[in-house]
From Swiss-Prot:
The active site is at S162 (nucleophile), D186 (charge relay system), H271 (charge relay system). GO terms for cellular component: catalytic complex; cell surface; chylomicron; extracellular space; plasma membrane; very-low-density lipoprotein particle. The modification 3'-nitrotyrosine is found at Y124, Y194, Y346. Residues 1-27 form the signal peptide. Residues 246-269 are annotated as: Essential for determining substrate specificity. This is Lipoprotein lipase. It is found in: Cell membrane; Secreted; Secreted, Extracellular space, Extracellular matrix. Pfam families: Lipase (PF00151), PLAT (PF01477). Glycans are attached at N73, N389. The keyword Membrane applies. Keywords: Calcium, Cell membrane, Chylomicron, Disulfide bond, Extracellular matrix, Glycoprotein, Heparin-binding, Hydrolase, Lipid degradation, Lipid metabolism, Membrane, Metal-binding, Nitration, Secreted, Signal, VLDL. It comes from the Eukaryota. Residues 35-56, 446-470 are annotated as: Interaction with GPIHBP1. It comes from Ovis aries.
Length: 478
């Protein structure tokens, strides 16, 4: 008799554990139309514009009342934010910032934050493996919303950071219909660089997949962010390696000022920059940063890729043009070290002339640009080689919009060490014209010396060039 009582008591406790979960809601209600949602561990918080930092209301798959209780807007688009690996087991500070920026740009939208913190706090390889289960959770949730409420998945935009980008990709591959867009914010590299498409973010996971790569420094498979292109458009700001303001010198300065408590922030500075670049695109919609298609970052650094013909340039971030090429498009741009991140790109071409054949390596120069709106002075650049009667192309950028170019100054910087030959006779070149192309406006300008030729000497005064007045030159420059 006593054993039967104990058995009934144990059975009662077991049934109670099945039927009570998540704020007292009954788990049995999560069996809807023959589908069991009780295996979903991820939580889906619909945050509000008034409280972007707290998960105050959860949408629970299988519990239809939760959708009404959270005031889900069925007629608006939905953003689903998926965080990455975490050391602390808490949301990182960028999450409420992204939520706030999304609501500021799309006030009537739904912004859902996926909580998989318990799985994301494990050792990295374990958390990386969990992205498959998290992706399955998100897919089940989205399919339920589509089936139960006829909510169109074409209104869904998934945004995943680091490991969350791959979870977003897996989710997109498992939904009954494709979601509209997935944005990968520096998708994680380790365990995914050589993974097959079904196990990571890929172009097939949504109608359009765009990716920002901001921390790809290191050998493939060991860099924090994935190196290879995994979307329809893959953008590599500042080459995709280190980001401005995230260098070692900055790290030492911050440690000296704030102590070692911020070391983890510095380690992920470039990684997390992907999120802040996207936030910038939401808040500064009238001035989107422009990226340019290029075969390599080396060619981009030479200024050879500032063309916008045939979709060769695109906006970075929220206002990207959804161009779906057969092959993934790798694009590059420069940015500032802080918001707003937009800069203005220029290709500069200089022909160095002379009667004597000379070659100099690793030469430092400064150029100053003057326009109708502002000027940008003493912009440093280095040419790996300068030889007589050769033309060199390189990339410059300014942090301010200087308007239409009117004039420029060019200076050849003297060596930091003393040289008897330079003291006795400074080397120099004749320069007749300098060609400049503005990436943002696509305008080309040819600058001429005030004389027929200007003699540029190392360590001497800068040489001034003004816009050429020859109409035929202007026609050729486009």
């Amino acid at each position: 008799m006593e054993s039967k009582v104990l058995l009934l008591l144990a059975l009662s406790v077991w049934l109670q554990s099945l039927t009570v979960s998540r704020g007292g809601l009954v788990a049995a209600d999560r069996i809807t139309r023959g589908k069991d949602f009780r295996d979903i561990e991820s939580k889906f918080a619909l945050r509000t514009p008034e409280d972007t930092a707290e998960d105050t209301c959860h949408l629970i798959p299988g519990v239809t009342e939760s959708v009404a209780n959270c005031h889900f807007n069925h007629s608006s688009k939905t953003f689903v934010v998926i965080h990455g690996w975490t050391v602390t087991g808490m949301y990182e500070s960028w999450v409420p910032k992204l939520v706030a920026a999304l609501y500021k740009r799309e006030p009537d939208s739904n912004v859902i934050v996926v909580d998989w913190l318990s799985r994301a706090q494990q050792h990295y390889p374990v958390s990386a493996g969990y992205t498959k289960l998290v992706g399955q959770d998100v897919a089940k949730f989205m399919n339920w919303m589509a089936d139960e409420f006829n909510y169109p998945l074409g209104n869904v935009h998934l945004l995943g950071y680091s490991l969350g980008a791959h979870a977003a990709g897996i989710a997109g591959s498992l939904t009954n219909k494709k979601v509209n867009r997935i944005t990968g914010l520096d998708p994680a590299g380790p365990n995914f660089e050589y993974a097959e498409a079904p196990s990571r973010l890929s172009p097939d996971d949504a109608d359009f997949v765009d990716v920002l790569h901001t921390f790809t420094r290191g050998s493939p498979g060991r860099s924090i962010g994935i190196q290879k292109p995994v979307g329809h458009v893959d953008i590599y700001p500042n080459g995709g390696t280190f980001q401005p303001g995230c260098n070692i010198g900055e790290a030492l300065r911050v440690i000296a000022e704030r102590g070692l408590g911020d070391v983890d922030q510095l380690v992920k500075c470039s990684h997390e920059r992907s999120v802040h670049l996207f936030i910038d695109s939401l808040l500064n919609e009238e001035n989107p940063s422009k990226a340019y298609r290029c075969n390599s970052k080396e060619a981009f650094e030479k200024g050879l890729c500032l063309s916008c013909r045939k979709n060769r340039c695109n906006n970075m971030g929220y206002e990207i043009n959804k161009v779906r090429a057969k092959r993934s498009s790798k694009m590059y741009l420069k940015t500032r070290s802080q918001m707003p991140y937009k800069v203005f790109h220029y290709q500069v071409k200089i022909h160095f002339s002379g009667t004597e054949s000379n070659t100099y390596t690793n030469q430092a120069f400064e150029i100053s640009l003057y326009g109708t709106v502002a000027e940008s002075e003493n912009i440093p650049f280095t040419l790996p080689e300068v030889s007589t009667n050769k033309t060199y192309s390189f990339l410059l950028y300014t942090e301010v919009d200087i308007g239409e170019l009117l004039m420029l100054k060019l200076k050849w910087i003297s060596d930091s060490y003393f040289s008897w030959s330079n003291w006795w006779s400074s080397p120099g070149f004749d320069i007749g014209k300098i060609r400049v192309k503005a990436g943002e406006t696509q305008k080309k300008v040819i600058f001429c010396s005030r004389e027929k030729m200007s003699y540029l000497q190392k360590g001497k005064s800068p040489v001034i060039f003004v816009k050429c007045h020859d109409k035929s030159l202007n026609r050729k420059s486009g």
